[in-house]
Regions:
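C-terminal effector/interaction modules appended to NTPase cores
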Residues: 2-146, 150-157, 267-810
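Canonical P-loop GTPase G-domain recognition
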Residues: 181-189, 194-284, 288-293
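Conserved NTP-handling cores and scaffolds of large molecular machines
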Residues: 112, 163, 214, 218, ...
Length: 810
């Protein structure tokens, strides 16, 4: 019997097809090897090498990095307090008004029996301690003199912060610490006098209270008792041996704090003279052909640099004394004098004080006026206005009388939208009162009074408005801005196309193009701009000077053309600090700062308000404009400095190379200056676009499926046709455009991407570029000394009114 063949199952046409595994279509290892053909990626190769380091090699690398950091710290310590290095500069900060700094200084004087103690006319105490092989200079600014403290802290190596056993740190002490933190805090040591005189039970409680308050700002610091000479010796050792902090804006530039100050007038009738500042040079090398800056007074040139003998040497034996200055060639003006001239200025190589560009009128695209037109404009500006006024009328009263023949001038381009709207309302009231004035002309006897056009400025200078009412108006305006941001009412008596002639519509604020070089103001022809700012900064910072005074030398700097008002307002005990400028740092450009409003500041700060800036080593006043701190090419203008978020302040100012800390102060009516914001330098960029937004609003009159009739946005047919290309949006998220005008009273038909709600509002966004005003002023007056912080000069009634004004809007 034959064996039957084995049958196997054969799939039919209806076989189930399972889906293939979705592996993401990644290439296999073999496919990648075939494509690369043995080549290895550079990143992978370096990564393998890093991972293949042996344990001993990694340990050796860590030890080398640790040794390098330790050597850097030791090198900084060796650069202070030695024989050929400047003394360790210490600033005593009284954090409570009841602290007697004289007791602290007396204890430091007797810290070491072998120490040599000297004190100069500027109030700087010098201690030469052979035991530690260190020199220490101690300066104590007056309590309440904030500028003296900030200027001294700019060049300080260490702050000796004195706290009390009662309040530890008072309100003014907290204010000083906030300013010092914003400016750049050097190393700090906390001491307390009178701690050991407390009962033993109270010492533990007081110690906990002090440590808790200190740890809020300085978590790693502890306070030291300073009651005996032994305590003082430990404090001096702590001052000279602790790690120093880096403050880059100071360490990158040469700086001198005045040990001796003298002033010589150029001649008896001159308003300027030569200021001689003698002190230890710190930081970098100082060249006489560079410029120096005096905080609060501006930039100056130098005539020469002298090298007198060091009056506070560490080695007191004349035979063993070695002058580092003798390594260079110097000439002496007098053979019997110890003063040697290090360097004299070379007029051919000396840096110029020109901070602005002289614009060429023929280089601009606009037509420049002729000399006849300029002369005519000047005569028009000086022209007197003759009015008929009643007899006995003063100049002040005559300025308020409206002349029927006087033409109503247009609003200035620099005025804000709110000011222009207020002017339009006031104009209507003036027109109604003008008729009543003309009716009484025949009944009143008149005389002719000549009034200059600048009477308004005279009136403003003599005006003394109530500060509480100003604050109330600002609070109202800020609240309205928060509730209805950037919304502007369209004027009914002025065409919108002329009212918003400088504005433009943007399809997208983020992506729409905007040329930063178009329609620039005339002030932009006076400023400087770098092709590559970062590269210029790197070149200026890394530049080494072969000639000049070296850090650590005791020098006398002759500063030329210093105003006589400087020495007239100078008070002994206030520090005089000189900072050498890097190349290009005296040239004016557009400077941007990122600042944040202080949490305890309640009053609104409007854009274009006068503020006082402390930027690194500079101090000046300006009227900044605020804008949002965002990414992109365009940044929205802010009418007020917001609370809780960072904002960019833009001003015309001399160029500064970052990093530089920023302190912003606002002057009060009583001459005090309050800290309102802190921040840092952002950039120097004239091409940064700050766009102001104006939002026109309209309301639906009739609503269809996708179209609606909108009114109250415009009031004539021509304005609707003019703004027809601009996109519309609503508060509820609809988008649309103008289709056609209806009638002659401002109604228009608009089409949207969906049906509108009856309670919705139609908005149109318009933008114009904003520029800061040229209000830079390097001369800043020193504020009054605060005897008790936070009291001011207000009466109790004024305080009650101010509190009521704030409560209305909280």
């Amino acid at each position: 019997m034959a064996v039957e063949p084995q049958k196997s199952h054969r799939p039919g046409p209806l076989k189930q097809q399972n889906k293939a595994h979705k592996h993401g279509k990644h290439k296999s290892k073999g496919q990648l090897e075939r494509e690369t053909k043995g080549r290895v990626n550079v990143k992978v190769l370096s990564k393998k090498n890093r991972q293949s380091m042996k344990k001993a090699e990694r340990r050796n690398q860590a030890l080398q990095m640790r040794k390098q950091k330790r050597d850097e710290v030791l090198e900084k310590k060796r650069n202070r307090g030695g024989t050929n290095t400047p003394p360790h500069f210490v600033v005593v900060v009284s954090l409570d008004r009841n602290i007697d700094t004289k007791v602290l200084l007396d204890l430091l004087k007797v810290a070491d029996d072998s120490a040599v103690v000297k004190q100069n006319e500027q109030g700087i105490l010098h201690l030469s301690i052979p035991r530690f092989k260190q020199r220490v200079s101690i300066f104590t600014p007056e309590y309440g003199n904030l500028y003296a403290l900030l200027d001294a802290a700019k060049v300080a190596d260490t702050l000796l912060c004195a706290v009390s056993t009662d309040n530890v740190i008072d309100k003014y002490g907290e204010h000083c610490l906030s300013c010092l933190y914003g400016q750049g805090m050097p190393a700090a040591v906390f001491v307390c006098n009178g701690f050991k005189s407390l009962p033993m039970k109270k010492q533990a409680e007081t110690r906990k209270l002090m440590q808790r308050k200190i740890e809020k700002r300085f978590p790693a610091e502890k306070f030291h008792s300073l009651d005996t000479s032994q305590d003082a010796l430990l404090v001096v050792r702590q001052l000279t041996n602790q790690k120093l902090r880096n403050i880059q804006y100071r360490d990158l530039r040469p700086h001198v704090i005045g040990e001796e100050i003298s002033f010589e007038l150029d001649n008896t009738e001159s308003d300027t003279g030569t200021l001689k500042v003698t002190g230890y040079l710190r930081g970098k090398t100082l060249s006489v052909n560079r410029l120096v800056h005096i905080p609060g007074w501006g930039d100056f040139q130098m005539l020469q640099i002298d090298a007198p003998d060091d009056p506070y040497p560490l080695n007191l034996h004349p035979g063993k004394q070695h002058r580092k200055n003798q390594d260079v060639e110097m000439e002496s003006e007098d053979p019997h004098s110890d003063v040697r001239v290090l360097e004299r200025c070379d007029p051919g190589q000396q840096e110029s004080l020109d901070s602005e560009v002289l614009p060429d009128p023929m280089m601009g695209e606009q037509t420049w006026p002729t000399e006849e037109e300029l002369a005519e404009a000047e005569s028009e500006s000086r022209k007197k206005i003759v009015k008929r006024v009643p007899k006995g009328t003063s100049d002040y009263q005559a300025a308020w009388i409206i002349d029927s023949d006087e033409e109503e001038g247009g609003d200035s381009e620099e005025e804000s939208d709110e000011e222009m709207d207020a002017d339009m309302e006031a104009q209507e009231e003036d027109d109604s009162s003008e008729e009543d004035l003309n009716d009484d002309d025949d009944k009143t006897e008149y005389e002719t009074v000549t009034i200059a056009e600048d009477d308004a400025s005279k009136y403003d200078a003599a005006m003394d408005l109530d500060e509480d009412m100003q604050m109330l108006a600002k609070l109202k305006e800020e609240k309205q801005h928060v509730q209805f941001p950037d919304e502007v009412d369209t004027p009914a008596n002025v065409t919108a196309r002329s009212r918003f002639a400088r504005y433009r519509g943007l399809k997208s604020f983020r992506t729409s193009p905007w040329d930063p070089k178009e329609n620039l103001p005339s002030d932009y022809a006076r400023i400087f701009q770098f092709e590559n700012f970062k590269r210029t900064k790197k070149r200026c910072v890394e530049e080494d000077m072969d000639e000049g005074a070296m850090p650590g030398w005791y020098v006398t700097v002759h500063v030329a053309n210093v105003p006589k008002a400087f020495i007239e307002g100078y008070q002994p005990g206030s520090p005089v600090v000189l900072f050498g400028l890097l190349p290009h740092e005296h040239k004016v450009s557009i400077v941007h700062f990122v600042v944040k409003k202080c949490a305890d500041v309640e009053q609104p700060i409007r854009s274009k308000d006068r503020l006082i800036f402390h930027v690194g080593y500079r101090r000046f006043s300006a009227n900044p404009i605020f804008s949002q701190h965002t990414l992109g090419s365009k940044h929205k203008f802010e009418r007020f400095m917001p609370t809780g978020t960072a904002v960019v302040a833009t001003v015309y100012a001399p160029i500064l190379f970052p990093p530089s800390p920023v302190l912003v102060f606002q002057e009060t009516a009583y001459g005090e200056q309050s800290l309102v914001a802190t921040g840092t330098l952002l950039s120097v960029n004239p091409d940064r676009i700050v766009a102001k937004r104006a939002v026109l609003s309209g309301y639906p009159f009739k609503i269809n499926k996708r179209s609606a009739v909108i009114r109250y946005m415009f009031f004539n047919r021509e304005d609707i046709s003019w703004f027809k290309p601009v996109e519309l949006r609503t508060k509820w998220g609809r988008r649309g455009h103008i289709k056609e005008p209806l009638g002659t009273h401002g109604h228009m038909k608009c089409v949207f991407d969906g049906k509108m709600k009856s309670q919705d509002t139609v908005l149109m966004n318009l933008y114009k570029r904003m520029y800061p005003k040229w209000t830079y002023n390097p001369h800043v007056t020193t504020p009054t000394v605060v005897k008790e912080y936070g009291t001011g000069n207000m009466d109790s009634d004024d305080k009650a009114e101010e509190g009521a004004a704030f409560q209305m809007f909280q």
